[in-house]
UniProtKB/Swiss-Prot annotation:
PANTHER family: ATP SYNTHASE, ATP SYNTHASE SUBUNIT BETA, MITOCHONDRIAL
Source organism phylogeny: Bacteria, Pseudomonadati, Pseudomonadota, Betaproteobacteria, Burkholderiales
UniProt source species: Burkholderia multivorans (strain ATCC 17616 / 249)
Gene name, Swiss-Prot/TrEMBL: atpD
GO function terms (MF aspect): ATP binding; proton-transporting ATP synthase activity, rotational mechanism
Alphabetized CDD domains for the sequence: ATP-synt_F1_beta_C, ATP-synt_F1_beta_N, F1-ATPase_beta_CD
Protein name: ATP synthase subunit beta
Length: 464
């Protein structure tokens, strides 16, 4: 605590999550200073200095029972959270306090949640591929080690299930440390995730930070920074960390909720005018340096399935790979419902992924694109009016579409079939056989919900 620790102020106004506090004029708190309500653990974070000793703050917790005249103390420092190994295997809230009833977190090191992004000369771009074991992702939008990935999708198309499968496949194979930030999502999912990690014996390598749907906007606004601070510490120690955020949209939404109360004019669609800056501050910190790497996977909710909405649109520019989940594909019963024509990755370059992988990816996309163009003709005139080449393209495209589906480990309860991890070599071999016409004699249903191409051949024998 600094010398300003003893400075006291009084609450002069409460509007929802935004609280105004008056301090002596000569000792106004700095922006982002943490203030503590006298006699309780409630923390306020300074957002604006209104002048005349009055500061406007966001309440990080429920503001029930607050009234004018209550005493508030200035800690003189920004919010600091415990970092390092003692956080592993623990569930914490936005202030780094344990919420898993497993005793205090014995961490000697604390770090402010507001840090500067690494300088440009410290950054370390990576082209090494990170195998996920999910066919559609490894083929169409491969991830880079130390890269940033976004899972975009509307309500109920499978963002969280996809993220859980990625955590299952990468975190277990990866063997390093992971940080999971639950930002404004369902408490049930947080609970499921905790037990999933516990059952698979990787809980002692994961730090969990939650600020869920039922919490005030201040918590949801800052919880992503809390998780990121913990991940940054591991990175600066020279480790390779995985950082999962579910859901980045709720971070934006929490900012929108408090923006109007802070007296800012809303911008497009009612979002805060500082949307790009807030997103930039967060995203620029999620990066790999010469010391260590942060590989991040972020779920991004797409309001009303509109990818041009300011929130997802702002997120797009920061990512290395975008996995777009489509309602049309989900409605066909193809899961993961990844849109192979909309999803992209900066790694799709023959110099990075190799000539074979690159050409197979492009051939698969061309076949699917041709099928998309022919769909209207098929709907009106039927398949008989197509040329033999087009008929072949359609047949192969439908097989590719089904082969892009895959049973997940985390969805075994729903599908009843065991999950499959498909190595990248097998994925490339399978799709090469389909586009080369080596599977033209097989029925398309043989490709649905299988792992490798060999399983499709086995399934075809049973069908025939």
């Amino acid at each position: 605590m600094s010398t300003a620790a003893l400075v006291e102020g009084k609450i002069v106004q409460c509007i929802g999550a935004v609280i105004d506090v008056e301090f002596p004029r000569d000792s106004m708190p700095k922006i982002y200073d943490a203030l503590i309500l006298d006699g309780s653990e409630l923390t306020l974070e300074v957002q604006q200095q209104l002048g005349d000793g009055v500061v406007r703050t966001i309440c990080l917790g429920a503001s029930d029972g607050l009234r004018r005249g209550l005493t508030v103390k200035n800690t003189g420092n920004p919010i600091s959270v415990p970092v390092g190994k003692p956080t592993l295997g623990r569930i914490m809230d936005v202030l780094g306090r344990p919420i898993d009833e497993a005793g205090p977190i014995e961490s000697e090191t604390k770090r402010s949640i507001h840090q500067k992004a690494p300088a440009f000369d410290e950054l370390s771009p990576s082209t090494e591929l990170l195998e996920t074991g999910i066919k559609v992702i490894d083929l169409i939008c491969p991830f880079a080690k130390g890269g940033k990935v976004g899972l975009f999708g509307g309500a109920g198309v499978g963002k969280t299930v996809n993220m859980m499968e990625l955590i299952n496949n990468i975190a277990k194979e990866h063997g390093g440390y992971s940080v999971f930030a639950g930002v404004g999502e369902r408490t049930r999912e947080g609970n499921d995730f905790y037990h999933e990690m516990k059952d698979s014996n990787v809980l002692d390598k994961v730090a969990l930070v939650y600020g869920q749907m039922n919490e005030p906007p201040g918590n949801r606004l800052r919880v992503a920074l809390t998780g990121l601070t913990m991940a940054e510490f591991f990175r600066d120690e020279g480790l390779d960390v995985l950082f999962f955020v579910d859901n980045i949209y709720r971070f934006t939404l929490a900012g929108t909720e408090v923006s109007a109360l802070l007296g800012r004019m809303p911008s497009a669609v009612g979002y805060q005018p500082t949307l790009a800056e807030e997103m930039g501050k967060l995203q620029e910190r999620i990066t790999s340096t010469k010391k260590g790497s942060i590989t991040s996977v972020q779920a991004v909710y797409v309001p009303a399935d509109d990818l041009t909405d300011p929130s997802p649109a702002t997120t797009f520019g920061h990512l290395d790979a975008t996995v777009v989940l489509s309602r049309d594909i989900a409605s066909l019963g193809i899961y993961p419902a990844v849109d192979p024509l909309d999803s992209t990755s900066r790694q799709i370059d023959p110099n990075v992924i190799g000539e074979e992988h690159y050409s197979i990816t492009r051939r698969v996309q061309q076949t699917l694109q041709r099928y998309k163009e022919l769909r209207d003709i098929i709907a009106i005139l039927g398949m008989d009016e197509l040329s033999p080449e087009d008929k072949l393209s359609v047949a192969r495209a439908r097989k590719i579409q089904r082969f892009l589906s895959q049973p997940f480990h985390v969805a075994e309860v729903f599908t009843g079939s065991p999950g499959k991890y498909v190595p990248l070599k097998e994925t490339i071999r399978g799709f090469k056989m389909i586009v080369d016409g080596e599977c033209d004699h097989l029925p398309e249903q043989a490709f649905y919900m299988v792992g490798t191409i060999d399983e499709a051949f086995e399934k075809a024998k049973k069908i025939q």
